[in-house]
Amino acid sequence: MAAPKSTATRARRGRRVVKKNVTQGHAYIKSTFNNTIVSITDPKGHVISWASSGQVGFKGSRKSTPFAAQLAAESAARKAMEHGMKKVDVFVKGPGSGRETAIRSLSTAGLEVGTIADVTPQPHNGCRPPKRRRV
């Protein structure tokens, strides 16, 4: 006969948080019309920390505000500084409203901003854009 299952809860097995010692890296800010996502990586491209407007606690149309982008960038910067990050090069993508605010809040959080590059993809007359909104 099979042994009865124990009712004791088992400890959750997950990835152990490894503290990396990375002093400089890249910060990628993707700012769309609906959300802002900030990812901070080491120079090889491995993600150290990330945050988005939705993860910080905003829902719906408030995710697209500059204030939500500011809090997301501060959250990502704080997590990265726990791993020893001091200097970042910033790559900004997208047309959203949180671009400049996110860059500013990275520097006010304590990270030294090196270069700032706009890597927004520009189509060579690719896909047809969505139709204009009539409000």
From Swiss-Prot:
Keyword Ribosomal protein: yes
PROSITE patterns documented for this protein: RIBOSOMAL_S11
Keywords for the protein's UniProt record, in alphabetical order: Ribonucleoprotein, Ribosomal protein, RNA-binding, rRNA-binding
Keyword field contains RNA-binding: yes
Pfam families: Ribosomal_S11 (PF00411)
GO BP annotations, alphabetical order: translation
InterPro entries listed in its UniProt record: Ribosomal_uS11, Ribosomal_uS11_bac-type, Ribosomal_uS11_CS, Ribosomal_uS11_sf
GO cellular component: ribonucleoprotein complex; ribosome
Family: Belongs to the universal ribosomal protein uS11 family.
Protein purpose: Located on the platform of the 30S subunit, it bridges several disparate RNA helices of the 16S rRNA. Forms part of the Shine-Dalgarno cleft in the 70S ribosome.
Summary of subunit composition and partner proteins: Part of the 30S ribosomal subunit. Interacts with proteins S7 and S18. Binds to IF-3.
Name of this protein: Small ribosomal subunit protein uS11
Organism: Corynebacterium urealyticum (strain ATCC 43042 / DSM 7109)
